[in-house]
């Protein structure tokens, strides 16, 4: 790149910095008015920057509708570029702070509901012991919503069970955990070493709704049952199914992740499922593919990987 071209690029960045930030805010908010409210500026100022950017690019970036706005194809291309620029800037800031001997930063995490308890709490505790100035935002989210949140830059990392492969997502860590039936300690099946789905359906059963990965893992075994079965309750809430099982209302299905305290306090029993063999559920940690990771985020991912390995080892030591 020539000196003249470098000067032109720097000037373009200076001119478009505000427009790109406003564009990203509008994309996230879904409307110019809401973006202006979040930025604490006038709607007209935001609209002016968007129009300027559209004029420079020579194409509309948003389709305007009565209920809000949506990205056009050109807008989606710009959104990918803006996301890379902002995340690279975040990494540069983190690296500079690292050179000063101070790790700071903010990490946004989306995790499936059952993981936002013991597992994530343990990871955040270990992270803050090593980087006291880091801040964390942790949001429970369904497995199907997590890839989009990571790819859109709404969160830095996602933690989910059984995600299908995605070219734009990179799996940076994974733990393999056995699916089991959870029930009250006084349940007739609680003392067994393992149970089949057919045995579980001799009693009231609580089943996950379709959007939960547990349901997808159970589907092949359910299809092989030689009788029609009907759960007494269906729910998309991991916490609700856990609570119902603890109260003796029925049998639910989960991995041991997040059940540590319940099992230790003898409020729940986890009995491994046998469907001609174990049913395994992979808990993966994901970031956007190709992203250069800030030092603080990289550290958080290493801690998550360590925590998952430790839990795999602990589960393997439980008698089958």
Where are these regions (language model features)?
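Central regulatory/effector-binding core of bacterial HTH transcription factors
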Residues: 104-167, 317-319
């Amino acid at each position: 790149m020539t000196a003249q071209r470098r000067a032109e690029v720097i000037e373009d960045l200076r001119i478009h910095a505000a427009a790109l930030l406003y564009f990203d805010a509008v994309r996230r908010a879904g409307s110019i008015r809401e973006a202006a409210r979040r930025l604490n500026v006038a709607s007209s100022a935001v609209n002016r920057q968007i129009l300027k950017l559209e004029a420079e690019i020579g194409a509309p970036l948003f389709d305007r509708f009565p209920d809000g706005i949506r990205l056009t194809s050109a807008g989606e291309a710009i959104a990918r570029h803006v996301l890379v620029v902002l995340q690279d800037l975040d990494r540069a800031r983190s690296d500079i702070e690292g050179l000063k001997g101070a790790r700071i930063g903010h990490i946004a995490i989306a995790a499936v509901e059952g993981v936002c308890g013991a597992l994530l709490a343990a990871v955040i505790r270990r992270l803050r012991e090593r980087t006291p100035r880091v801040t964390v935002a942790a949001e429970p989210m369904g497995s199907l919503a997590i890839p989009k949140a990571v790819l859109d830059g709404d969160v830095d990392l996602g933690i989910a069970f059984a995600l299908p492969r995605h070219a734009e997502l990179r799996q940076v860590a994974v733990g393999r955990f056995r699916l089991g039936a959870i029930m009250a300690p006084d349940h007739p099946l609680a003392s067994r070493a393992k149970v089949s789905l057919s045995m579980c359906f001799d009693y009231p059963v609580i089943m996950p709704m379709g959007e939960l990965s547990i349901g997808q893992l159970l589907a092949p075994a359910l299809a092989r049952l030689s009788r029609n079965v009907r759960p007494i309750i269906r729910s998309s809430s991991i916490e609700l199914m856990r609570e119902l099982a603890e109260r003796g209302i029925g049998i639910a299905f989960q991995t041991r992740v997040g059940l540590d305290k319940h099992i230790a306090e003898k409020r729940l029993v986890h009995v491994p499922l046998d469907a001609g063999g174990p049913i395994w559920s992979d808990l993966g940690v994901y970031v956007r593919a190709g992203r250069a990771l800030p030092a603080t985020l990289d550290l958080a991912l290493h801690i998550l990987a360590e925590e998952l390995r430790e839990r795999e080892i602990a589960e393997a030591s439980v008698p089958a």
